[in-house]
């Protein structure tokens, strides 16, 4: 009975707060409130600003190689495993794939900022 009462009160309170949050902002609508916040930029301007694709590729490459650190961090704890050959082979394969990816990026001139 006590649990049912707590569940009922929580449900009613949650529903009441959701309804207040839904209807309260609609009471006083004005023009500035309806506009999106664009950090000082003109919200009616073009959304298609020029973006450097080279910067995007360097950022993605950084994220991929940064993920390497997250994958290699557990290695000191994995050394304490009984089957160290599996851990060594796995880390060697991971580092080899990353080295091949770095070599490919280098050969494709993906690491050069200027063209």
Swiss-Prot record:
Subunit structure: Core subunit of respiratory chain NADH dehydrogenase (Complex I) which is composed of 45 different subunits. Interacts with TMEM186. Interacts with TMEM242.
The protein's name in its UniProt record: NADH-ubiquinone oxidoreductase chain 3
Key words of the record: Electron transport, Membrane, Mitochondrion, Mitochondrion inner membrane, NAD, Respiratory chain, Translocase, Transmembrane, Transmembrane helix, Transport, Ubiquinone
This protein's GO CC annotations: mitochondrial inner membrane; NADH dehydrogenase complex
GO molecular function list: NADH dehydrogenase (ubiquinone) activity
Superkingdom: Eukaryota
Native source species: Peromyscus eremicus
GO biological process: mitochondrial electron transport, NADH to ubiquinone
Enzyme class, UniProt record, top EC level: translocase
This enzyme's EC code(s): 7.1.1.2
Membrane topology: Multi-pass membrane protein
Chief site of localization: mitochondrion
Catalytic reaction annotation: a ubiquinone + NADH + 5 H(+)(in) = a ubiquinol + NAD(+) + 4 H(+)(out)
Family statement: Belongs to the complex I subunit 3 family.
Record-annotated membrane-spanning stretches: 4-24, 55-75, 87-107
Role noted for this protein: Core subunit of the mitochondrial membrane respiratory chain NADH dehydrogenase (Complex I) which catalyzes electron transfer from NADH through the respiratory chain, using ubiquinone as an electron acceptor. Essential for the catalytic activity of complex I.
Cellular compartment(s): Mitochondrion inner membrane
């Amino acid at each position: 009975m006590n649990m049912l009462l707590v569940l009922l009160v929580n449900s009613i309170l949650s529903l009441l707060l959701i309804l207040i949050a839904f209807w309260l902002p609609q009471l006083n609508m004005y023009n500035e409130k309806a506009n999106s916040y664009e950090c000082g930029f003109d919200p009616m301007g073009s959304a298609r600003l020029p973006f450097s694709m080279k910067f995007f590729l360097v950022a993605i490459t950084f994220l991929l190689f940064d993920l390497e650190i997250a994958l290699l961090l557990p290695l000191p704890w994995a050394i304490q495993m009984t089957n160290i050959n599996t851990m060594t082979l796995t880390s060697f394969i991971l580092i080899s794939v990353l080295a091949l990816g770095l070599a490919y990026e280098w050969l494709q001139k993906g690491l050069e900022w200027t063209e």
